[in-house]
Amino acid sequence: MFINSFETKIKKKFSLLYEKLDDEDENEPSSSPSNSTNNFYKACPEDNSSKWSKISFNWVTKLIMKGYFKESLEMNDIYDLPELNKVQTTSKLLDDINFSNGSKYALIKHIYKNFLPKNKYALISNIFITIFIFLSPICLKFLINYISTDNDNEKSILKGILLCCLLCISILGQSISQELFYWFGMKNSFDVRGALTAKIFEKTLKLSNVSKKKYRSGKIMNIMSIDVENISEFFWTYYLDIVSHTLQILILLGLLCYVVGPSGLVGFGVMVIALPINTMLCTKSSNYLEKSLEYSDSRTNLTSELITNIRPFKMYAWENLFINKIEEQRKQELKFLFLRVLFWIFDHMMIETNATLVLVSTFATYSLTGNTMSLDVTFTAMTIFANLKLPLIYLPEDIYKAIGLMPSVKRIQNFLKSSESLKSKENNQNINFNNNNNNNNNNKNNNNNDDNDIIIENCTFQWNEPENNNLFEFNQSEDEEENEEEEEEENEENIKINENFDYKLNDINLIVPKGKLTMICGVVGSGKTSLVCGLIGEIYKLNGSVSGVPNNISFTSQQPFLLSASLRENILFGNEFDIERYKKVIESTALTKDIVNLAGLDLTEIGERGINLSGGQKQRISLARALYANSDCFIFDEPLSAVDPEVASHLFDHCIQGIDFKSILKTKEIKKNVENETDSEELIKNEIEIENEIIDVNNVISDKNDPNLIEKAKLLVKEDKNEGEVEFNVYKKYFSYGTSGVTLFITISLFFIGQAVYKVSDFWLAIWTERSIEGKSDSFYIGYYLLIIGIFVSLLMIRTYSLSRITFGIGKNLHSALLKSVTYASCRFFDTNPSGRILNRFSKDTSDIDIHMLDLLSEVSICFSELTIGLISIVFIIPIIIIPLTLLFIIYYIYQRLYRPSARELNRWESITLSPVFSLLQECYNGLLTIRTYKQESRFIKEMFDNININLGCIFYSFAVHRWISMRLEVMGCIMVFFTSLAAALFTSNNGLAALSVTTALSLNGYLSWGVRRIVELEVKMNSFQRIQSYIEIPKEGNKLISTGTNQVDSDGLKTISNGDLVNWPNKGIIEFKNVEIKYRPNSEPNLKDLSFKVQSSEKIGIVGRTGAGKTTIASSLFRMVECSKGLILIDGIDISKVQLQKLRSSIGIVPQDPFIFTGTIRSNIDPFNEFTDFEIWESIEKVKLKDAINSMPLKLETALQENGDNGFSYGQKQLLCLCRTILKNFKIILMDEATSSIDYHTAQLIKQTIQENFKDCTTLTIAHRLETIIDCNKIAVIDSGQLIEFDTPSNLMNIPNSKFNKLIKSQTDYSNNKIK
């Protein structure tokens, strides 16, 4: 109550100052242009501040006051970064790294060469630190001499005050130098961090197909977060500390020899003997950290794969399979992290033991050589030892950082040296960071190539990198010794991949004439996509020549790449908005009707990978992007495979056939060879009946200034930011994951007991010096001193080990809970949160919990136990000191209350602003081919630079706020030392205790600021816990079972049907939809409206309709990927909403529209639970016509596949592999969603026969645009705008002249007419 009243008064006192500062801030000019998208808008106040303001950090006061009065900071409260610290500037310093000499230290040498000269002020500050460290013990020696003098004539008050002032000046000088050293060092670290992050992203945009196999997105995220942080931390202060701490140790040992004579050399010898042991322990700790990072990479990659493919994982009911795989990697990661911590504990134990042995050996030698332990000698030596203890602690840590730095340097250097796409080398010459890259495709490049035919002569293309590759600008040969071990590990990991899939296109000859349509046809897996990639420079050309390829190419990939942005932004793709051209493109791609049905029209956010769109809509948006780019050459890879015949005909007429420039259509549909030349009119005759429904294209273009429409258009939710202090319940929740309250209390108590024991050792030295126990020799005092220190070291080991067990248990349980919670979350969660944001919880936030929480909890406990015991000791010795200490405590409280809100909020913004960095990295990684083809690298680099600058801005001002509080509390500490030393000199009769009080005050000086900073840092890391906890508490899918003894309930408390009741379910396969309504968003229009139909046992149902009509939504509802808002879905008479999800999904077979291959072998992809024999697996492989392809691979079923199977199979073959796994299992109900859309006509007919033979007793729902795929079904369901408009046999529907199905039949192209007739 008193504290709240006091704080209210303080706020009133400061309110006028805040208003004045706020008015000044509002009048400050903007540092960003008016059209800038940067969230910062005010220039950095440090740039225009006075020298005194820079030294005292007064320029940060405005930000401090904002945070205090608002209790929260918004992004527009944070100032802009100084221009010199922006990544646009710092990244240039890494532009010319020379890897050609094969040096394993090339990166680190380059950083030293380019970044160290900027850090001269840090070096100067470090020199002053060393000088003041030397002066403070000398000043203390004179002061203790004064205190121990019994002659009143020599003990004038003025002399005492002067000596106290000199001591405080030396301490204050050291403190100011230390803070400036940290600040200048941080700026250097900051620049290194920004530059490396930028370079890693730039390199990601250049990765070749071979490099992508090695560097999955999860591994790159780990490199960008963990490894970059390791290097930047080293270039904060550690690189200078190695020299300065060594120098400080030598100076202090020299000073020790000055105080105690040659006895100091004995202590020096003990230290020299012990230092190699500490170094060895640091090295072992570093090795275990490197091992843990390898498993962390693997865990993050698997987690990334799970998150980005969460829908197929859920549909196949494979969540537990991947959870177990991730947990296994996590177990190994924690194992090596714990071993690292054990050696860290031993290291700290050795440091404490070493410091004590140095002190005891020095004092023992000094005493045994006939010298008397006087006050000035004892306590001056104690102060020297106290000052010596820090460099003794930090020098092994500096060495550890230097040793631990090399694995991170190696990982980043190898990544930056990895092979690049040939296309990226071509594009890199034209990258311009000073514009938005809006015109690179709009204006035709007047290159001679644009008017020529594309000619490919005698070319051989290959996916894998040639053995002697001379296609790169730098030499790939590396230091053999450095890379030998890594190459062996890489071979073990990738031998199955690299040896098996050396796919080549041999002796290719092709002419693509300007102004004509060229079609590339072939059976599945014949190399069509490889040829297209050869044209655009994405695979290696071993021989031959390619000429006439224009600079501007529009490209649509077989699996469309879409940004997590609005539909309009996906079409514009960085180009300027031309409304007339935009309208024309929308009409040409038949998107008008689709856009009208979207909540925010063309400004609707379509989500990562177009998650809320149908396959046909995604393809048409990709096609619209190609047309809008207005390029010289258009390359379409299967642009019609996911659209219905009517739309396909429209697209062919208005998009593909109507282009005036070079255009290439890659398809498996036209049964002609490349060698056969004929006009496109002869290949495809369009007999399309245009739908009568006409929609004005003007009605689909949104007004960006309409707030209601913008709100409706949003899909992604804003990331939550915790505000205010971290409450006690948060800490309680954190510790509940790993320990009981009793264990925690005992562990924390050990810190206070340990510090009390250590303080007893100081009292014992005072007793020893005063010879308070008569008749006892020095060996008596030495023996008991060693006993006290032995108890302290034992307590240190016990408390640190106990705390490490607690934190590691918490980290393990927290990650497990996070993984399960996210995996079992509803699909809506993944629709509204980008994968980069989710992965941030598993990388950066998890790393904070694993690595930093132990250190922080230990440091906070040490700090406050030391402050508590130390202050009690001082007050016990000098009771009068409580008066100035109370006043100092009040000031201390005010400062920490001013400081904590801003520091806490800035650190929270740091975590939040890191998510867009990871999200953009993930997004660009998935769309490298499209980004490079459209030459959009510079646009995404600029966006990434902006994201990095925003994140670095939060770090920059967070650190400035830390220095602000440190500077002020260090001054307070000096004042405390002054009053304590003055009171000891004037008011204490016991000279030994007086000297002890002064040395205690000196030791507490740094703890005042350190304690507050550690508390705020702990609050920040608890923010990582809160972010993880918020994901643990997200709503789960229904019917995820929670064990409650013998009974089972689902996560929403509803009773479910147990698996025991559904042992043979479904045994008939009867499916019934009753008035089903489905909504993807709560307030949106239904995607399925009042849908009712019934499928009898073993019936074959074909589901057709215009692209985006709701066909795939039917599939999603059957698997409960989205729950019914109205109505029921029954299978064999049982309401599926009451069936456990695991049981439901594992009981229905699925061949998804987008083929799903996960990281593993061919065998594990077909039979993930190892349920079937080799014979059964090969039998199913033969049925889907993949036997020859897999048999040609040396390792056959054990062939390793990467995520999405990009290293082994074509898109069509991946579809066949998915069909294979479905045939293998005996499902009663099977759903096929465009199962053969990317397979050539001949193979599709063979697969159709296989399906008829193997699924004859199954109930099948087949979604297809190829009408010949479903023409033999028992019934056809025609879906339009989410409604069932026709449901009858094919023959009956065909006999109705105006039926929708009949119209679809008529619009089918000639390749299907033969079958239909």
Swiss-Prot record:
The gene is abcC14. Residues 427-449 have a biased composition (Low complexity). Keywords: ATP-binding, Membrane, Nucleotide-binding, Repeat, Transmembrane, Transmembrane helix, Transport. It comes from the Eukaryota. Residues 119-404, 744-1027 form the ABC transmembrane type-1 domain. One of its GO terms (molecular function) is ATP hydrolysis activity. Residues 490-710, 1071-1306 form the ABC transporter domain. The keyword Repeat applies. Residues 426-451 are annotated as: Disordered. It is a multi-pass membrane protein. It comes from Dictyostelium discoideum (Social amoeba). Pfam families: ABC_membrane (PF00664), ABC_tran (PF00005). This is ABC transporter C family member 14. Its main location: membrane. One of its GO terms (biological process) is transmembrane transport. Belongs to the ABC transporter superfamily. ABCC family. Conjugate transporter (TC 3.A.1.208) subfamily. GO terms for cellular component: membrane. The chain crosses the membrane at residues 127-147, 156-176, 249-269, 341-361, 375-395, 734-754, 778-798, 871-891, 969-989, 992-1012. ATP binds at residues 522-529, 1105-1112. The keyword Transmembrane helix applies.
